[in-house]
């Protein structure tokens, strides 16, 4: 009995040490592996497995997901690819897959989503070139051309985050090499300028009666009746 108790004590001590060495769920351990919660269910065929005595997130092939030199989730790496969170689920058929050892957001075809730079990078990328004439490659970063997500560009178009899902049939599409929010018809949503064009979310003109005065609603109808009576 004493031998059994001693073995149990040693095993408990080893388990305690192993647990202490494990990173908290949601963090990366000293080897850059993503620590998961075994009680959670993860998307994209990923699972929480015990590896080296710690619960680690593994991909569909059972390999641990490494952070290594990957960009932080929500940022772009040095190749302009969007870094994602392997524990999150993404819209529009997008998914978070391990590419070259890093969790990257890929489209429905499994190709990494690349931030547009104004030039085509060839096969295997999802960069979209503009229908306008080709421009020389910029030596600056791609972010210098596109407005930050949540801001408007110089043309008043809303810059969006390709990893987000937007309501009312709106989608985030790459137009003129920048991610822009589009309405259900695929047209960019433009910030209202008061020009009264009535397109792309701009306000329409109010009815004009008489010498340029602006009347709306019932007042416009009354004014029209008065003019007709005269």
From Swiss-Prot:
GO terms for cellular component: vacuole. The keyword Signal applies. Residues 1-19 form the signal peptide. It is found in: Vacuole. Disulfide bonds: none annotated. Its main location: other. Keywords: Signal, Vacuole. Disruption phenotype: Affects proper autophagosome formation, asexual and blastospore development, and virulence. Leads to severe defects in secretion of cuticle-degrading Pr1 proteases and melanisation of infected insects. Reduces the transcript levels of all autophagy-related (ATG) genes including ATG1, ATG5 and ATG8, except unaffected ATG26. Vacuolar protein required for aerial conidiation and conidial maturation. Also involved in blastospore production and cell cycle. Plays a vital role in the secretion of Pr1 proteases for cuticular penetration and hence contributes significantly to host infection and virulence. This is Vacuole-localized protein 4. It comes from Beauveria bassiana (strain ARSEF 2860) (White muscardine disease fungus).
């Amino acid at each position: 009995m004493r031998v059994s108790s001693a073995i149990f004590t040693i095993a408990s001590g080893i388990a305690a040490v192993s647990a202490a060495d494990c990173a908290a769920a949601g963090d990366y351990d000293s080897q850059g592996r993503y620590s998961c919660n075994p009680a959670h269910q993860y998307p994209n065929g990923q699972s929480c497995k015990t590896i080296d005595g710690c619960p680690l997130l593994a991909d569909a092939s059972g390999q641990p997901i490494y952070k290594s030199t990957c960009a932080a989730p929500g940022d772009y790496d040095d190749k302009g690819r969007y870094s994602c969170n392997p524990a999150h689920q993404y819209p529009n058929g997008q998914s978070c897959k391990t590419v070259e050892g890093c969790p990257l957001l890929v489209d429905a075809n499994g190709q990494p989503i690349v931030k547009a730079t104004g030039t085509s990078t060839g096969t295997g990328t999802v960069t979209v070139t503009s229908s306008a004439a080709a421009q020389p490659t910029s030596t600056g970063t791609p972010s210098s051309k596109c407005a930050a997500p949540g801001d408007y560009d110089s043309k008043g178009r809303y810059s969006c985050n390709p990893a987000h899902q937007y309501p009312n049939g709106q989608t985030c599409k790459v137009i003129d090499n920048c991610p822009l929010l589009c309405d259900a018809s695929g047209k960019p949503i433009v910030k209202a300028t008061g020009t009264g064009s009535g397109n792309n979310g701009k306000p329409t003109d109010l009815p004009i009666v008489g010498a340029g005065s602006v009347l709306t609603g019932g007042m416009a109808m009354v004014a029209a009746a008065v003019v007709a009576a005269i």
